[in-house]
From Swiss-Prot:
This is Acyl-protein thioesterase 1. It is found in: Cytoplasm; Nucleus. It holds the Pfam family Abhydrolase_2. It is an enzyme of class 3 (hydrolase). The active site is at 125 (charge relay system), 179 (charge relay system), 212 (charge relay system). It comes from Debaryomyces hansenii (strain ATCC 36239 / CBS 767 / BCRC 21394 / JCM 1990 / NBRC 0083 / IGC 2968). It catalyses: S-hexadecanoyl-L-cysteinyl-[protein] + H2O = L-cysteinyl-[protein] + hexadecanoate + H(+). Hydrolyzes fatty acids from S-acylated cysteine residues in proteins with a strong preference for palmitoylated G-alpha proteins over other acyl substrates. Mediates the deacylation of G-alpha proteins such as GPA1 in vivo, but has weak or no activity toward palmitoylated Ras proteins. Has weak lysophospholipase activity in vitro; however such activity may not exist in vivo. Belongs to the AB hydrolase superfamily. AB hydrolase 2 family.
Length: 232
């Protein structure tokens, strides 16, 4: 059940909440690793009415990661080889995490009366991959996607299993050109794949010299994107 999914939940300070952001962390991180974002959003004054946003930062389960010699760490799915888009992928684990994100979306709809089109999903690295896949698999429309340093582990099967509910949904993809973990070209190929599949509002943002992280410029661009989505 969705209420059992471990997450850092930051409730809107202005009631009732009118929108929600669900942001999924990357490998080895936790929900608390991104729980500073609501404060940044408020201080930046970029996102209007940010006090009426529910924030959810889910925690990944612990699992052995093959590419790290089997070391157990928080992960949304196993990684067999870093930086290689052609490497073997943990398809079952990946889909399980997509189901987790779907449950969190439905939690906001069912328990907090947030309209689906006012829910933005997103994430960093593994979390971005899960968010990008989930928006393609959902059978109802959400507000938008923020994918930072993202990729698609299911690029071969996605055309056969995707739904079309979110073809008009705006998607923000940001990627640093110096990323050694998720190669920049892997991110760019994912953006091109989504455009080829019929997603009409995919915007790929390039950040020169940025490694596997989110720069201040990227975060500001993401917040401007969120503001545009939520004010519609």
């Amino acid at each position: 059940m969705s209420q059992l999914i471990p997450a850092v939940r930051v409730a809107a300070t202005a009631k009732p909440a009118k929108s929600a952001i669900i942001f999924v962390h990357g490998l080895g991180d936790s929900g608390s690793g991104w729980s500073w974002f609501p404060q940044l959003a408020k201080q930046s004054n970029i996102i209007k009415n940010c006090d009426s946003i529910n924030y959810v930062f889910p925690n990944a389960p612990l699992m052995p990661i093959t590419a790290n010699g089997g070391y157990v760490m928080p992960g949304w799915f196993d990684i067999y080889e870093f930086g290689n888009p052609e490497a073997k992928q943990d398809i079952d684990g990946f889909h399980k995490s997509c189901e987790t994100l779907k449950s969190l979306i439905k939690e906001q709809i069912d328990n907090h009366d947030i309209p689906a089109d006012k829910i933005i999903i997103g994430g960093f690295s593994q979390g971005a991959a899960v968010s990008l896949a989930t928006v393609a698999l959902l059978d109802f429309k959400v507000g938008g996607v923020v994918a930072l340093s993202g990729f698609s582990p299911i690029k071969e099967s996605l055309p056969q299993i995707m739904n079309k509910a979110n073809l008009e949904t705006p998607i923000f993809q940001g990627h640093g050109t110096a990323d050694p973990i998720v190669n920049f070209d892997f991110g760019k190929q994912t953006s091109e794949l989504y455009q080829k599949l019929g997603f009409k509002n995919v915007k790929f943002h390039t950040y020169p010299g940025v490694a596997h992280s989110a720069s201040e410029e990227e975060l500001a661009d993401a917040m401007n994107f969120i503001d545009d989505v939520l004010k519609k």
